Amino acid sequence: MYSLPGATMSAAPASIISSSSFVEPLLLAAASPAAAAAAANSHHQVRQRGHLVRTLAASSSSNTLLRSDFDLQEGLTTDVKRMLRQRQKKSGGGREMLVTIDNLKRLCIDHYFEEEIEGAMATGACTRLLHSDDLFDATLAFRLLREAGHDVSAKDDVLRRFIDGASGDFKLSLSNDVRGLLSLHDMSHLDVGGEAALLHRAKEFSSRHLASAVRYLDDPSLAEYVRQSLDHPYHLSLTQYKARHHLRYLQSLPSRDAAVERLAVAEFQLNKSLHQGEMREIKRWWMDLGLAEEIPVVRDQVMKWYMWSMAALQGSSFSRYRVEITKIISLVYVVDDIFDLVGTLEELSAFTEAVKMWDTVAADSLPSCMRSCYKALHTVTNEIAEIAQKEHGSNHVNRLRKAWAVLFDGFMVEARWLATDQVPTAEDYLRNGVITSGVPLTFMHIFSMLGYDDPSTEEEEEAIIDHMPSIISCPAKILRLWDDMGSAEDEAQEGFDGSYRDFYLMENPSRSPGEAEAHMRGLIAREWEVLNRECFCRRTFPSNLVQVCLNTARMVSVMYSYNKEQRLPVLEDYAAMMLVL
């Protein structure tokens, strides 16, 4: 149990950590693509692409939060701000202040203290710690500075002091510094280019010695924290998921920040209440839509779709957006299943042309299930365009319809490959797979609701989807590659549409499946490097858009990390943590 001094709601987070069994039925066969395919209809042709996890976020909760909840948060925020000012005055932004900032970030409550954090980072104390001979201080300072967009070098500013000149490896004396090794491990995932070899060595060194330390640590809380850090590296993992475990670890320490812990619990309670209300609203919409009854072979995984939105758009201010974007995600899944399981090539071509015309009359000649799907996506997309118009003064309906047209064209490419027994190159498959992942389409809708106008296009008909910046393409490619690794051997089906691994092995017959997977993991690592560079160096997009894209990339492994029983334990744990009563 969580026990926060003076906190009346401290028991809530503990109850969700162990309740994953309750969420299992709600994920609706999310544990295995094979289960979903079998449940659909075994006599239909299923393409090898598998679950195209479509990304992201939106929701408007029907749940009314009591004013007292916000008053409690406001009071706790004031307490923490007072503590930050005192700590800054006392330490001048030294280790104690940086540890506090790190805790605020890990607990997902740093957004309340942006001014205080920026002030502390600007004092120069963080830069001084960067050159410390203490591994923990130097690596923590590096990570916070890089995350804030500062130009720092892993080699020149930090790691060269901790490498043995004779062997070229990290000094063996560091192997017993568990706290420093944890921080080094966190730092090792922040490659932005040109540092891959050094940071890979840092990851190997820290991972090896942390794995060894788990066996002899006397503190069970610290041992569990180390295991969590190795299994779910901070930068690559969902911050909301990590926050619960970080809070539990903080509560095991002899020295604690009660105000910070209480605010973290209050924030969790508020978000959980919102998520539950949003989920109820989405379930009502999906049931009223009736597509699952009209098209029995389509996937019916409302909670799974919502969790993409919940992960990507975090915070109470995005509640309505989470609901709306979940609708988009669900319709991408439906369209995917229609292409996979329902339509003939001729019908799918007519479906695509109707979407391009963006006229409900154009859909009149389509089969009933396609008409219903078209009407739903037309309605939801126009509603999102109206939201953007009302809140930001820009109506992006033409860009959104263009995004749908691009997605349908991508599905048609795959349908023709299958119909003509054409075998694409791995590169061509992956390029088209970025589109059919659904990520670019979903991001277009999110960007519109967040009020983003692409400065690189002058005409409304032009869209960011035409020139696909890395902030969009990287999460999409990460998703496609993870999806293909997870589903290539899982999906029971007739027909063959292939995965990246299949096409790579065809082009490289001397390679084994294990080597193909290693190659794919290397591609994923390179996409993370490019995404990191966009997030931490270039800063060409607003921070809220960057965070959406980063959160999406982090969610991918949660959706596709199957265990030996073909279950998704992290997804189940995360759903229980954030949604179960």
Curated annotation (Swiss-Prot):
Mg(2+) 3 binds at residues 483, 487, 491. The keyword rRNA-binding does not apply. It is found in: Plastid, Chloroplast. Binds 3 Mg(2+) ions per subunit. Its cofactor is Mg(2+). GO terms for cellular component: chloroplast. Induction: By a musk indanone elicitor that mimics herbivory. By caterpillar S.littoralis oral secretions, in combination with wounding. By corn leaf aphid feeding. GO terms for molecular function: (E,E)-geranyllinalool synthase activity; magnesium ion binding; S-linalool synthase activity; sesquiterpene synthase activity. It catalyses: (2E,6E)-farnesyl diphosphate + H2O = (3S,6E)-nerolidol + diphosphate; (2E,6E,10E)-geranylgeranyl diphosphate + H2O = (6E,10E)-geranyllinalool + diphosphate; (2E)-geranyl diphosphate + H2O = (S)-linalool + diphosphate. Substrate binds at residues 299, 336, 340, 480. The keyword Manganese applies. It comes from the Eukaryota. Mg(2+) 1 binds at residues 336, 340. Pathway: Secondary metabolite biosynthesis; terpenoid biosynthesis. A motif (DDXXD motif) lies at residues 336-340. Its EC number is 4.2.3.48, 4.2.3.144, 4.2.3.25. Mg(2+) 2 binds at residues 336, 340. GO terms for biological process: defense response; diterpenoid biosynthetic process; monoterpene biosynthetic process; regulation of defense response; response to wounding; sesquiterpene biosynthetic process. Monomer. Belongs to the terpene synthase family. PANTHER family: OS04G0344100 PROTEIN-RELATED, S-(+)-LINALOOL SYNTHASE, CHLOROPLASTIC. The Asp-Asp-Xaa-Xaa-Asp/Glu (DDXXD/E) motif is important for the catalytic activity, presumably through binding to Mg(2+). This is Terpene synthase 2, chloroplastic.
